[in-house]
Design a protein with these regions (language model features):
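Amphipathic alpha-helical
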Residues: 1-17, 23
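Conserved, non-catalytic sequence blocks in retroelement Pol enzymes and Pol-derived host proteins
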Residues: 16, 39-40, 76-81, 120-128
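Two-metal-ion RNase H-like nuclease active-site motif
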Residues: 21-41
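Beta-sheet entry/capping signal
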Residues: 21-24, 46-48, 57, 103-106, ...
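C-terminal, well-structured subdomains that either form a transmembrane helix-short loop-helix hairpin
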Residues: 25-28, 78-79, 83-96, 107-109, ...
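A short, polar/acidic, helix/strand-boundary loop motif
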Residues: 51-87, 113, 122
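RNase H catalytic domain
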Residues: 94-163
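C-terminal functional segments of enzyme domains
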Residues: 141-193
């Protein structure tokens, strides 16, 4: 990390006055948990996000199916919901990077595990650490100040998009396809995705 990034990251760290968020982002992920191939075909792993911005008059939503090729690169575990949910904030930052540069962002997540990993900046699991690193590298590149908090699942508007249920344009919503950086470091096996 170069000196410029360090200086910027501490800028305003001692400001005690509350600051209004420029952008509020909700993220979520879904992963079929019964382990059956048929279920994954009907309800594939997905991520969803919702952005509310002072600069954008309409709420913005996005979703994306998480490809099996990406999931296969993660450490094996019975259920990959944590990794899927961790991918959602990365996709939100990347997709909406033009709105987020040098902004104060409130990120609301309904997964306690993902919230904790992002706040701590690490995890005992190597693949979780890797995605956490991608998230914070991206936040640093965008010079975004992020406050992360938990939102109850029932109060998370990104729950619908993470299951393929989008709000309609006639309800005032704008829909954009979520995407993630083409190059995400992958130290396990030195692969790039």
């Amino acid at each position: 990390m170069d000196q410029t990034h360090l200086e910027w990251s501490y800028e305003g760290a001692h400001d005690v006055n509350p600051k209004k968020s420029d952008v509020v982002i909700f993220t979520d992920g879904s992963y079929p948990d019964d382990g059956k191939k048929e279920t994954k075909e009907l309800n594939p792993p997905m991520i969803g996000a919702v952005m509310l911005s002072r600069l954008h008059l309409q709420p913005v939503q996005g979703m994306k199916i998480v490809p099996q090729e990406l999931i296969d690169q993660w450490l094996p575990r019975k259920n990959q919901i944590c990794m899927v949910e961790l991918l959602a904030p990365i996709a939100a930052l990347w997709t909406w990077r033009h709105y987020l540069r040098e902004k104060f962002v409130l990120l609301l997540i309904d997964s306690e595990v993902v919230e904790a990993a992002l706040i701590k900046g690490y995890s005992a699991r190597e693949d979780v650490c890797e995605l956490v690193g991608v998230f914070w590298d991206l936040a640093l590149d965008l010079r975004v100040q992020i406050y992360i908090d938990r939102v109850p699942t029932d109060g998370n508007p990104a729950d619908g998009p993470s299951r393929g249920r989008l709000f309609h344009a006639d309800q005032g919503w704008v829909t954009e396809d979520l995407c993630w950086p083409k190059v995400m470091k992958r130290e396990l096996g030195s692969q790039r995705i």
